[in-house]
């Protein structure tokens, strides 16, 4: 009886968050409206599981994982949703102070956010000598084409989106330097994890151009 209990405990420890989410997807518990929006952005049904699994595959921090999951399912709090819930007095975007702040507005169509993504594209070209088109689908759901820098690009995009979100919450000023500082802190965190798991050489190979 004791051995059986230990086996069950070990089995539970090995059942990761990633596997749990995969199990949910296998049982078709995904939000239908999320799937519809993904298809509207030009992805195929076969690509949808990759979009759902992206944050679990490349991220280590639970906060960032849940952040991207909320974007996928369009449940990330915005001024618009908070206003509808009567939590805030206005739905106006704190970044541009011009329009209602939906998720799409906050991350993509806001004039301040649009300028931020131009800086991101220029920075990426400078670091990797690659011209990266940041379409609405790429910003929202990630880059899913084969690329040597696939992991770095998607990780950087999620941190960049989080920086936009975090800046808009306290009515702050969105600047690119704050993103770079946040990204460098995250890279240091990933480096520590890689060192502790004896995968430092692999980490340095992946992130070489940003170290």
Features from the language model and the residues they span:
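Short linear motifs embedded in intrinsically disordered, charge-biased segments
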Residues: 1-37, 206-210
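Family-specific functional microsites
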Residues: 36-211
């Amino acid at each position: 009886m004791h051995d059986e209990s230990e086996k069950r405990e070990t089995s539970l420890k090995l059942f990761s968050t990633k596997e749990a989410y995969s199990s949910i997807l296998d049982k078709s518990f995904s939000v239908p409206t999320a799937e519809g929006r993904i298809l509207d952005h030009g992805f195929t049904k076969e690509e949808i599981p990759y979009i759902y699994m992206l944050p679990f595959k490349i991220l280590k921090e639970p906060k960032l994982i849940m952040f991207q999951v909320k974007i996928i399912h369009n449940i990330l709090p915005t001024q618009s949703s908070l206003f509808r819930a009567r939590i805030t007095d206005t739905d106006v975007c704190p970044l541009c102070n011009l329009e209602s702040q939906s998720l799409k507005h906050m991350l993509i169509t806001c004039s301040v956010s649009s300028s931020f993504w131009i800086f991101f594209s220029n920075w990426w070209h400078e670091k990797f000598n690659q011209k990266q088109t940041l379409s609405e689908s790429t910003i929202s759901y990630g880059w899913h084409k084969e690329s040597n820098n696939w992991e770095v690009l998607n990780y950087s995009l999620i941190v960049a989106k989080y920086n936009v979100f975090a800046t808009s919450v306290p009515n702050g000023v969105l600047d690119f330097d704050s993103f770079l500082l946040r990204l460098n802190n995250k890279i240091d965190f990933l480096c520590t994890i890689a060192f502790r798991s004896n995968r430092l050489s692999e980490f340095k190979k992946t992130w070489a151009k940003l170290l």
